[in-house]
């Protein structure tokens, strides 16, 4: 499942960072989920908890923040949000975009000029935005 692969990458990132910083414990992790990716937060959280088990990150607080998807037309410079056009997507299209966000260009066009030449300004992908660690001695 795609969410498990994402969770695995997040966990590896967190544990690598903690090791580099000499952490004795990971206390909290903040993860940004891009709206365009349409990730199932509950599955990612469950997977992270399972993958953290037996590590210095076991029991860490996991916080998710959704980043709104914003697009900008390269033709007319119009900016718009996914929520303004999301009703045009059926479940198959949502699934296609979930696995390969770049295909959004095949299904969306600028609401102002109709161009398919646009950039995803934000709201794509998944990334670790913060890691709170504890070092020996409680710092």
From Swiss-Prot:
Protein's gene: hypA
Its Gene Ontology molecular function terms? nickel cation binding; zinc ion binding
Tell me the protein's name: Hydrogenase maturation factor HypA
Gene3D superfamilies, sorted: 3.30.2320.80
Q: Which NCBIfam families match?
A: PRK03824.1
Is Cell cycle found in the keyword set? no
Indicate the family of this protein: Belongs to the HypA/HybF family.
The record describes its quaternary structure and partners as: Monomer and homodimer. Could also form hexamers. Forms a complex with HypB.
> Which residues are involved in binding Ni(2+)?
1-2, 98
Alphabetically sorted, this entry's keywords are: Metal-binding, Nickel, Zinc
Source organism superkingdom:
Archaea
List S-S links within the chain: none
Q: What does this protein do?
A: Involved in the maturation of [NiFe] hydrogenases. Required for nickel insertion into the metal center of the hydrogenase.
Which InterPro entries would you find in this protein's record? Hydgase_Ni_incorp_HypA/HybF_CS, HypA/HybF
Q: Its GO biological process terms?
A: protein maturation; protein modification process
The record lists the organism as Thermococcus kodakarensis (strain ATCC BAA-918 / JCM 12380 / KOD1)
Residues where Zn(2+) binds: 73, 76, 110, 113
């Amino acid at each position: 499942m795609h969410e498990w692969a994402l969770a695995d990458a997040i966990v590896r990132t967190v544990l690598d960072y903690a090791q580099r910083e000499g952490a004795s414990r990971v206390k909290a992790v903040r993860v940004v989920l891009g709206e365009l990716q349409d990730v199932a937060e509950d599955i990612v959280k469950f997977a992270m908890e399972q993958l953290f088990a037996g590590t210095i990150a076991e029991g860490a607080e996991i916080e998710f923040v959704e980043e709104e998807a914003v697009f900008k037309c390269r033709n007319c410079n119009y900016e718009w949000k996914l929520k303004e056009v999301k009703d045009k997507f059926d479940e198959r299209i949502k699934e296609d975009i979930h696995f390969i966000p770049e295909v959004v260009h095949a299904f969306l066009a600028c609401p102002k000029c109709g161009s398919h030449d646009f950039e995803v300004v934000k709201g794509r992908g998944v990334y670790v935005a913060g890691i709170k660690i504890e070092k020996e001695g409680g710092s």
